[in-house]
Amino acid sequence: SSTCIIKYPPGWHRNFTEYVLTDEEFYVLEGEISINNISYEVDTYAHLPSGFQRDSMISKNGAVLLTFFGGTLNINKSKENHSYDKKRLVLKTSAKDAEWNNVDLDALGLKEISSGSRLLSLFVDPLNNEITYLTGSVPFKAAQFPERHPVAQEFYVLGGVLAGNCGIMQAGAYCWRPPMVVHGPYGSPTGALILLRSIGGPLTTEIFPAVEHSYQPEHKPVLPSNLSEVGKIGIDLPKRY
């Protein structure tokens, strides 16, 4: 599996039938792309299961997509039909137009720490109950409780500023967290929009006793050894004037 940002240049197109033989999940960060004459603009999402047929893809003016592949990328251009699990298809969801707060907070164990946010479930896998969802955090409504999960979790900050136990994250920041790693609490001085995914099964949450949250935490990212030097580079927040 892989998580990547894919940039499609203006005029990019594929006008033939093909099948991607792994799950592809994406969220549009910039621009617009059309698949099978369905237009995906900024802040739209899709989950296209393995074997989903694509007859055309085009990006007239270019697009940037946050993309998740469920396995090794394998594209089949043969005329042989491939089946796919229709229960795992999310053809298009617009974050702007969707009905938010469609998440079972009790099942996820997030009720105690979600008072300062609202959630939008984008996809729940019927095979293993992995979930992809958006969290919109309001300004100056920080959580108080550290937490951990029995499954891996990754998230990408789509907008705003998020302050947590490893420092400040802003738009474009990414985190991969293995199972059972204690993290948080988080809060935002500006409001933040975050896309999160659980990997390895259903998301549940263990809550720890309350601690003090800081909106100006020390910058101390946890990184693989080959990225340790990158973690020492400070990134200034955008100026207000």
Where do the model's predicted regions map?
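A short, N-terminal "cap"/entry segment at the start of jelly-roll beta-barrel domains
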Residues: S1, I75-N129, K220-Y241
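Hydrophobic alpha-helical segments
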Residues: V211-H213
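Alpha-helical scaffold repeats of the Armadillo/HEAT/TPR superfamily
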Residues: Q216-E218
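Ligand-binding loop in jelly-roll beta-barrel domains
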Residues: T22, S39-Y40, S50-K79, V151, ...
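Short, structured motif recognition centered on aromatic/hydrophobic residues
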Residues: F26-E30, Y45, E154-G159, Y174, ...
